[in-house]
């Protein structure tokens, strides 16, 4: 996938073929990425979302965890403040850094549904909900119907379908109610960020 900023302006983020470096190329990216180019690409992506009529809630690095470098993390927090967004931090050092700035961050390790076994996934989700510790937790779930078209293009369709099956089940609804779990999205976190100084 290519960048949204002009390739010539973000060359330190690109492979030899002009594509954005992938998560498995993270070590090289962290060595060569120029901070000004990271900023250009982040701005281009946020602006593209806004130009599409969508309202972003947060900035994150997707598969790159918390940006991989302190300067990239700090840039991301500054951009989030400028755009009125939250920052999604996965790892404890970054979460601690946000809390030290008076900004909300999740309290527990992140759960990614792609890392759960498909066999017994519903039971695993149920146990995780029953054992959920107090505080703010983040689960990255990827629900989708897994229809014929998605099966042809998405090798992860089974993960998505099993997420959908559990999340829309009466069991999930009952567990959320009985365990008194409040489900929020990043809009709630974004609102908390905008009400705090954080600098």
Where are these regions (language model features)?
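Short amphipathic alpha-helices and their capping/turn segments at secondary-structure boundaries
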Residues: 1-5, 46, 79, 125-135
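Active-site gating loops and adjacent loop-to-helix segments of metal-dependent hydrolytic enzymes
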Residues: 1-29, 155-158
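Catalytic grooves of carbohydrate-active enzymes
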Residues: 52, 126-153
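C-terminal domain-boundary segment and adjacent tail
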Residues: 87-88, 154-199
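Histidine/acidic-residue-rich catalytic or RNA/ligand-binding cores of hydrolases
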Residues: 99-101, 117-120, 147-158, 197
């Amino acid at each position: 996938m290519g960048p949204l900023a002009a390739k010539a302006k973000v060359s330190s983020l690109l492979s030899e073929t002009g594509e954005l470096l992938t998560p498995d190329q993270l070590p090289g990216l962290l060595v060569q990425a120029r901070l000004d180019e990271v900023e250009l690409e982040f701005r281009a992506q946020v602006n593209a979302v806004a130009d599409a009529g969508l309202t972003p809630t947060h900035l994150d690095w997707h598969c790159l965890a918390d940006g991989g470098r302190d300067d990239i993390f700090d840039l991301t927090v500054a951009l989030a403040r400028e755009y009125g967004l939250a920052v999604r931090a996965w790892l404890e050092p970054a979460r601690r850094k946000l809390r030290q700035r008076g900004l909300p961050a999740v309290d527990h390790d992140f759960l990614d549904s792609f890392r759960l076994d498909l066999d017994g996934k519903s039971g695993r989700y149920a146990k995780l909900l029953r054992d959920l510790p107090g505080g703010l937790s983040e689960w990255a779930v990827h629900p989708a119907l897994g229809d014929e078209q998605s099966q042809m293009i998405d090798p992860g369709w089974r993960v998505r379908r099993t997420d959908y099956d559990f999340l829309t089940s009466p069991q999930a609804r009952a567990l959320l109610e009985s365990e008194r779990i409040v489900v929020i999205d990043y809009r709630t976190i974004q609102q908390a960020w905008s009400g705090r100084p954080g600098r």
